[in-house]
Every structure is written in structure tokens, then in C-alpha cells.
Amino acid sequence: MLKKPDRNALRDKRRRRVRKKIRGTAERPRLNVFRSLQNIYAQIIDDDRGVTLVSASTLAPELKGKLPSGGNTAAAAAVGELLAKKAIEAGIKRVVFDRAGYVYHGRVKALAEAARAGGLEF
């Protein structure tokens, strides 16, 4: 009997394929997004050094008590704004967006648009 591959396996396949092409540098680090059912996480990574430069999530102390839910588009937009603010304070303006195989829709799109509105270029 044929077994249909699950959505996470397909997403992981897309993520691996794209990660061969996307690489964050010191001049233009990679903005990585991870989405769970309850929260959303974003990091800006310099792949040359293997270092996370800036990170934000719905579990960050700045957002934890202020959001009714961490798993909706409003929370994702708040994470995008916080990430952009932290990145600009760290001197990062230009990034490469790595959606990690997720469809550019909903929470991923809300985070990306809020980060762009906050001053990040990608």
C-alpha cells in the first residue's frame, strides 16, 4: 500500500534543498524562521562563523506576558518587529530570508512583513 508522506517530512525535504543555496554571511546574515503549534521563533545567523547574532520568539521576556497566544499572526508580527529592532541595534540591516520550507503565508508572512516594516531589507 502506498503511504502518503507527512507534511513535516515534505517541509524538511524543501528546507534541505533550499539550504544548499541559501547561506548567511557577515555582510548579509540569514534570517531563519521556526514555527511550532504554540510559538514562533526567528534568528539571524552568520553561517560563516556558525553564530546566532540576534534571536526573538514569542517566549522572549519582552513579549511573553503581553501576547494572549504565541501561535497566531499577531504574535508572529510582534516577533518580527522585535527581531528587526534587535537587529538594527546590532548593526544588521540586510538579511537573507530563510523560511525553512514553510509556505510564505500566515505566520511566516506576518513575521517577514513586520521585520521589513521594522527596517530589515530582504
From Swiss-Prot:
Residue ranges of the region described as Disordered: 1-22
SUPFAM superfamilies: Translational machinery components (SSF53137)
CDD domains noted in UniProt: Ribosomal_L18_L5e
UniProt keyword Transmembrane helix present: no
Record's GO cellular component terms: cytosolic large ribosomal subunit
Keywords of this entry: Ribonucleoprotein, Ribosomal protein, RNA-binding, rRNA-binding
Keyword Ribonucleoprotein: yes
InterPro entries in the record: Ribosomal_uL18_bac-type, Ribosomal_uL18_bac/euk
GO BP annotation list: translation
The protein's assembly and partners: Part of the 50S ribosomal subunit; part of the 5S rRNA/L5/L18/L25 subcomplex. Contacts the 5S and 23S rRNAs.
Protein family membership: Belongs to the universal ribosomal protein uL18 family.
HAMAP family assigned to the protein according to its UniProt record, in alphabetical order: Ribosomal_uL18_B
Name of the featured protein: Large ribosomal subunit protein uL18
